[in-house]
């Protein structure tokens, strides 16, 4: 499989290493600014890339969105999470002409966590729910795209839910419809996501801990391996 990388930060550098270990070929990289240290052919426009089978994106909206406005002709795996609503609308439009895969978290374990959460919410309807995510001190966005995905699962199953980001500002007791959302930044934490169900005299915690960023890179490669054989459409872990 011949792969075009969109962005060449820490994540796509891992994708390149792991993909080549699997026997795939990196045919080029698209970056905002060409860098002498990038060890692959560099491009600025999708139309310039002639021999790729699939594109894998671990970049940011500033790089990705202008590319999506070009005539995108490759199956596309997207892991960018910024400006999510705008991104999903654009990917849905593109999926009429190419196969597109999107996930806010490329770990299959996190996908399993969303399924476990969907099963737990109806069973624990009277329990309070708090969501917490922790990441390294260089992560900019908060809360993480994965935590937003977990929140979306809850919203789809409970009515009149209210996200609470700063209880200090509220200065009032917790309301039944509140969903606490907490972000922690520190050190080199790869990624941790926890769902706390708090009931009377008992609590249940469901946690996913990423021990290496390789799980995200491998998830993107595995998605690409499947996507190249799919018809045009919008894909997630649910239907890939």
Curated annotation (Swiss-Prot):
Pfam families: DapB_C, DapB_N. It catalyses: (S)-2,3,4,5-tetrahydrodipicolinate + NAD(+) + H2O = (2S,4S)-4-hydroxy-2,3,4,5-tetrahydrodipicolinate + NADH + H(+); (S)-2,3,4,5-tetrahydrodipicolinate + NADP(+) + H2O = (2S,4S)-4-hydroxy-2,3,4,5-tetrahydrodipicolinate + NADPH + H(+). Coiled coil: none annotated. The active site is at 135 (proton donor/acceptor), 139 (proton donor). Its EC number is 1.17.1.8. Keywords: Amino-acid biosynthesis, Cytoplasm, Diaminopimelate biosynthesis, Lysine biosynthesis, NAD, NADP, Oxidoreductase. It is an enzyme of class 1 (oxidoreductase). It is found in: Cytoplasm. One of its GO terms (biological process) is lysine biosynthetic process via diaminopimelate. Gene3D superfamilies: Dihydrodipicolinate Reductase, domain 2 (3.30.360.10), NAD(P)-binding Rossmann-like Domain (3.40.50.720). The keyword Amino-acid biosynthesis applies. PANTHER family: 4-HYDROXY-TETRAHYDRODIPICOLINATE REDUCTASE, DIHYDRODIPICOLINATE REDUCTASE. Catalyzes the conversion of 4-hydroxy-tetrahydrodipicolinate (HTPA) to tetrahydrodipicolinate. This is 4-hydroxy-tetrahydrodipicolinate reductase. The gene is dapB.
């Amino acid at each position: 499989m011949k792969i075009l990388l969109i962005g060449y930060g820490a994540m796509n550098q891992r994708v390149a290493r792991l993909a080549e270990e699997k026997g795939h070929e990196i045919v080029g990289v698209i970056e905002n600014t060409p860098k002498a240290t990038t060890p692959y052919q560099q491009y600025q426009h999708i139309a310039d890339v002639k021999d790729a089978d699939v594109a894998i994106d671990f970049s940011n909206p500033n790089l990705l969105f202008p590319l999506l406005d070009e005539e995108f002709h490759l199956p596309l795996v997207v892991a960018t999470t910024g400006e999510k609503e705008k991104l999903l609308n654009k990917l849905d439009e593109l999926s009429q002409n190419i196969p597109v895969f999107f996930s806010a978290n490329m770990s299959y374990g996190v996908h399993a966590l969303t399924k476990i959460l969907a099963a737990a919410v109806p069973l624990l309807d009277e329990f309070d729910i708090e969501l917490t995510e922790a990441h390294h001190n260089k992560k900019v966005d908060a809360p993480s795209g994965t935590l937003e995905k977990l929140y979306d699962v809850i919203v789809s199953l409970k009515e009149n839910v209210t996200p609470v980001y700063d209880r200090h500002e509220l200065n009032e007791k917790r309301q039944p419809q509140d969903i606490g959302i907490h972000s922690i930044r520190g050190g080199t934490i790869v990624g941790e996501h926890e769902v706390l169900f708090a009931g009377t005299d008992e609590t249940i915690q469901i946690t996913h801990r990423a021990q290496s960023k390789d799980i995200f890179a491998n998830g993107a490669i595995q998605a690409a391996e499947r996507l190249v054989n799919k018809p045009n459409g919008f894909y997630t872990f649910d239907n890939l």
